[in-house]
């Protein structure tokens, strides 16, 4: 399967908040284990025990691309991903403010935006996530997987409701 046919799929219910995905991403791209240099970010709500890895969704009609005043962001048709041309990027952060997923990050050292590039088809966050909270799957399977998960959740909810009703 070509990289263009695959996407990152994130299951926040599996994420434990270990942040290993952030570390391996930063090491892969910048050679340092600094989570602030990562292209994937784990948003944490510690009191609720909720951790959500956030990464570029590689939107077809990307707000970051449409909002860039210097056209530094484009859609690579071959790899089916959104890319930043760092030679053109002026670091204005417009893309950061318009991304509906909060997936565009700003590198304060280089004064440029950074975002997931899918590691050229071999995402390291997936490789190192032992619990598979982050996976790299066939794009066509995402909708099917989400429907199966919704059906599973509905089944669990029905069983809980039936058990609750039986106790009344």
Regions found by a protein language model. Give the residues of each.
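Ordered, amphipathic secondary-structure segments that act as subunit-interaction surfaces
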Residues: 59-81
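A generic structural signal for beta-strand entry/edge sites
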Residues: 7, 79-81, 113
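The canonical Cys-X-X-Cys-His
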Residues: 21, 68, 99
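Flanking helices and flexible, charged tails adjoining ferredoxin-like Fe-S electron-transfer domains
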Residues: 2-5, 37-38, 43-65, 86-168
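Local sequence-structure signature of Cys/Sec-based thiol-disulfide redox active-site neighborhoods
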Residues: 4-12
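A positional/architectural concept
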Residues: 16-27, 33, 38-45
């Amino acid at each position: 399967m070509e990289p263009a046919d695959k996407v990152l799929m994130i299951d926040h219910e599996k994420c434990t908040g270990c942040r290993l995905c952030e570390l391996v991403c930063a090491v892969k791209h910048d050679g340092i284990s600094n989570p602030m240099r990562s292209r994937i970010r784990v948003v944490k709500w510690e009191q609720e025990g909720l951790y959500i890895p956030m990464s570029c969704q590689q939107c077809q009609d990307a707000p970051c691309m449409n909002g860039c005043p210097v056209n530094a962001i484009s859609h690579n048709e071959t790899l089916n991903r959104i890319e930043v041309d760092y030679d053109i990027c002026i670091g204005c952060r417009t893309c950061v403010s318009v991304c509906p997923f909060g997936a565009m990050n700003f590198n304060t050292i280089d004064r440029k935006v950074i975002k997931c590039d899918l590691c050229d088809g071999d995402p390291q966050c997936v490789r190192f996530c032992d619990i598979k909270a982050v996976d790299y799957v066939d794009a066509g399977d995402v909708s099917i997987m989400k429907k199966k998960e919704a059906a599973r959740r509905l089944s669990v909810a029905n069983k809980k409701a039936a058990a609750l009703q039986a106790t009344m």
